[in-house]
């Protein structure tokens, strides 16, 4: 809302023929290593980029509003600068992938049965998983996502705790819309907070055991 209510931002959209702000989706991004000079050192900063939807269910990422970046000082809760690199034509075709918006793409695949008549080869007791002499405890936390604890083989300790600490995604392009992007997906967004719930009989086939994740 800080960006949408800024007159400079509204003027940049009007140059592109966009007047209905309800159809504009704004994505806040970490400011990266290049913070705009209008934001004081030590203040929390982000850069906001925008996308246009035809309606509330549209895939906004198909229509980026290229050239416009909003610099936001989160400490002061205000937009300090609107960067405008000029009007770039927006794709006209929609990119919705729901069944009602797409033609029939192919015949339905043949049914696949994955069975283990004698049951699975693993055992689960609480968060303890046992398989082929291996034992490991599993959990999920908001930052790292899946975490393995006390991994052992035939009673011999191998790892006390192992997890993915972070993942850095540098975009690696000179384009001003992307050159500053170097996202830390773990520490800035949280692997665990972005996990999806799985449904038995839908997401996986075979002898499946789902575990609860408490964060």
Predicted regions and their residues:
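Beta-strand/loop-rich accessory regions of lumenal/periplasmic or secreted enzymes
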Residues: 4-215
């Amino acid at each position: 809302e800080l960006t949408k209510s800024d007159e400079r931002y509204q003027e940049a959209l009007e140059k592109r023929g966009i007047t209905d702000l309800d159809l504009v989706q704004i994505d806040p991004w970490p400011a990266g290593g290049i913070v705009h000079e209008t934001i004081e050192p030590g203040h929390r900063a982000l850069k906001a980029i925008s996308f246009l939807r035809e309606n509330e269910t549209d895939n906004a990422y198909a229509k980026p509003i290229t050239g416009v970046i909003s610099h936001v000082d989160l400490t002061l809760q205000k937009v300090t600068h609107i960067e405008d690199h000029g009007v770039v034509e927006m794709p006209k075709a929609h990119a919705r992938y729901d069944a009602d918006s797409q033609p029939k793409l192919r015949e339905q695949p043949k049914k696949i049965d994955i069975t283990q008549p004698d049951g699975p080869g693993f055992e689960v007791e609480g968060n303890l998983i046992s398989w082929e002499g291996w034992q490991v405890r599993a959990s999920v936390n908001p930052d790292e996502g899946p975490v393995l604890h006390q991994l052992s083989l035939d009673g011999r300790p191998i790892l006390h705790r192992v997890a993915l600490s972070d993942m850095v995604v540098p975009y690696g392009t000179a384009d001003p819309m992307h050159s500053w992007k170097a996202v830390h997906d773990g520490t800035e967004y949280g692997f665990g907070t972005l996990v999806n719930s799985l449904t038995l009989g839908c997401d996986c086939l075979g002898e499946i055991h789902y575990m609860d994740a408490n964060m």
